[in-house]
């Protein structure tokens, strides 16, 4: 920690022996050892607290990134939902219009047709008139909508 060599420690020990004396030196050395131990524990506690705070800070940053990603995904999903809803409403309106037109066409076909006036030809001067045949009734095969395939 302090980069002190063995010879420097020996010099400090000899000076302490001369200054403090041989009777009090063991007690002072024990007290200094306890103080150094407490200082090391305190430094280690501070280091571990700093590590925990750094890890918590990293976790908070990660959580914030995940929250931001979740918000962007929700926004994207809402936009997609709105787009799909608009498309569905447009298709539903178009389908309703088509159904209404088809209903009108069916109701118009069910109405009794007025007889067409007889057309006289130059070759036929008789009272014989040609009748106009009504359109043939639709068969079940004709009622199926076209699928776009030639099968």
Curated annotation (Swiss-Prot):
UniProt membrane topology term: Single-pass membrane protein
Basic and acidic residues composition-biased segments: 93-103
Annotated compartments: Cell inner membrane
Source organism superkingdom: Bacteria
Transmembrane regions: 1-21
GO cellular component: TAT protein transport complex
A GO molecular function held by the record: protein transmembrane transporter activity
GO biological process, one term: protein transport by the Tat complex
Region (Disordered): 66-151
Coiled-coil regions listed: none
Biased composition (Low complexity): 109-122, 133-151
Protein keywords: Cell inner membrane, Cell membrane, Membrane, Protein transport, Translocation, Transmembrane, Transmembrane helix, Transport
Quaternary data: The Tat system comprises two distinct complexes: a TatABC complex, containing multiple copies of TatA, TatB and TatC subunits, and a separate TatA complex, containing only TatA subunits. Substrates initially bind to the TatABC complex, which probably triggers association of the separate TatA complex to form the active translocon.
Family, similarity comment: Belongs to the TatB family.
HAMAP family linked: TatB
Protein role: Part of the twin-arginine translocation (Tat) system that transports large folded proteins containing a characteristic twin-arginine motif in their signal peptide across membranes. Together with TatC, TatB is part of a receptor directly interacting with Tat signal peptides. TatB may form an oligomeric binding site that transiently accommodates folded Tat precursor proteins before their translocation.
Name of the protein in question: Sec-independent protein translocase protein TatB
């Amino acid at each position: 920690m302090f980069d002190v060599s063995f010879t420097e420690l020996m010099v400090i020990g000899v000076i302490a022996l001369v200054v403090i004396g041989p009777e009090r030196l063991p007690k002072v050395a024990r007290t200094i050892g306890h103080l150094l131990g407490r200082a090391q524990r305190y430094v280690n506690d501070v280091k571990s607290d700093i590590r925990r705070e750094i890890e918590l800070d990293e976790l908070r940053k990660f959580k914030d990134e995940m929250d931001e990603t979740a918000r962007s995904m929700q926004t994207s999903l809402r936009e997609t939902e709105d787009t799909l809803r608009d498309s569905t409403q447009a298709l539903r309106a178009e389908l309703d219009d088509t159904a209404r037109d088809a209903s009108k066409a069916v109701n118009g076909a069910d109405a009794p047709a007025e007889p067409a006036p007889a057309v006289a030809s130059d070759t036929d001067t008789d009272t014989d008139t040609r009748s106009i045949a009504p359109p043939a009734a639709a068969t079940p095969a004709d009622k199926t909508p076209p699928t776009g395939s030639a099968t």
